[in-house]
From Swiss-Prot:
Keywords: Decarboxylase, Lyase, Pyrimidine biosynthesis
Species, as recorded: Paracoccidioides brasiliensis
InterPro entries associated with the record: Aldolase_TIM, OMPdecase, OMPdecase_AS, OMPdeCOase_dom, RibuloseP-bd_barrel
Gene Ontology cellular component terms for the protein in this record: cytosol
Gene assigned in the entry: URA3
Ranges in a coiled coil: none
Pathway connected to this protein: Pyrimidine metabolism; UMP biosynthesis via de novo pathway; UMP from orotate: step 2/2
Active-site feature positions: 95
Protein name: Orotidine 5'-phosphate decarboxylase
E.C. code: 4.1.1.23
GO MF term list: orotidine-5'-phosphate decarboxylase activity
Catalytic activity: orotidine 5'-phosphate + H(+) = UMP + CO2
Pfam families xrefs: OMPdecase
PANTHER family, per the entry: OROTIDINE 5'-PHOSPHATE DECARBOXYLASE
């Protein structure tokens, strides 16, 4: 895969064919932030409080909405309002991993109503490429696009889980290659990958149908203090993640569980942005 990580966000925004990618890069440039907060909290109050306090300093808020013990329609309405107020995107870390017809119903329908509020979702490739085909099919229908593919809603997009940061992960080799192949078939809907690095060595190519590809890389497991935990999570620092090709760095406990989450998010923003500027400083048009 051809990485564009050496190019500034503003330039990538001006060139990108995916509307949500353009918006994402624009937000990052405006806020001088490449931080994604993984808000793995269990009550609506905690989630909405974090969204309101940290929203001005982040590009994306990542949720596991099904771990909320008191989820209600009001929670989702309030979350959307805060995303609009503070200009950040919502990423539901659902990791769809079922047959196509099932994930279509999980995404666009069901009790969580994910497509109605999440700008970004993700999937794993364990069920095969049909899962990406199915989600892209749903997102391409005239009915879906008329509701969500507009400036107010901001569009919808998919990240493919190409690699994981947990020790012993099987998301390697042929699995990662399959992820890239699936993304290339649906470039209008696939924003990029959740990966530990830029995937330059996976099916290298510079253009697709004459158009230079630019998949966005989100890296999880970013921490300023820890190297791992008792459950096999392996961490990178903001600097090392960006140096390895991360466009956006995802941190959870390092921010939301900090004594002062606001102070923590500012530290992550400062280090992540400094690493980004160092990465693109040699770029010339």
């Amino acid at each position: 895969m051809s990485s564009q990580s050496h190019i500034p966000y503003a330039v990538r925004a001006s060139r990108h064919s995916n509307p949500l990618a353009r918006q994402l890069f624009q937000i990052a440039e405006e806020k001088k932030s490449n931080v994604v907060v993984s808000a793995d909290v269990t009550t609506s109050k905690e989630l909405l409080d974090l969204a309101d306090r940290l929203g001005p300093y982040i590009t994306v808020l990542k949720t596991h909405i099904d771990i909320l013990t008191d989820l209600s329609p009001t929670t989702l309405t309030s979350l959307k309002s805060l995303a609009s107020k503070h200009r950040f995107l919502l990423f539901e870390d659902r990791k769809f991993v079922d047959i196509g017809s099932t994930v279509q119903k999980q995404y666009h329908g069901g009790s969580l109503r994910i497509s109605e509020w999440a700008h970004i979702v993700n999937c794993a490739m364990l069920a095969g490429p049909g899962i990406v085909d199915a989600l892209a099919q749903t997102a391409s229908t005239p009915e879906f696009r008329s509701v969500y593919a507009n400036e107010v809603e901001g569009g919808r997009a998919l990240l493919i889980l190409a690699e994981m940061t947990s020790k012993g992960s099987m998301a390697t080799g042929a699995y990662t290659q399959l992820s890239v192949e699936a993304a290339r078939r649906h470039r209008a809907f696939v924003l990029g990958f959740v990966a530990t690095r830029a995937l330059n060595d996976v099916l290298p190519v510079s253009t697709v149908d004459g158009d230079e590809e630019d998949f966005v890389v989100f890296t999880t497991g970013v921490s300023l203090s820890a190297s791992g935990d008792a459950l096999g999570q392996q961490y990178q620092t903001p600097t090392s993640a960006v140096e390895r090709g991360a466009d956006f760095i995802i941190s959870g406990r390092g921010i939301y569980a900090a004594e002062d989450p606001l102070e923590a998010v500012l530290r992550y923003r400062e280090e992540g942005w400094k690493a980004y500027l160092e990465r693109v400083k040699g770029w010339k048009a």
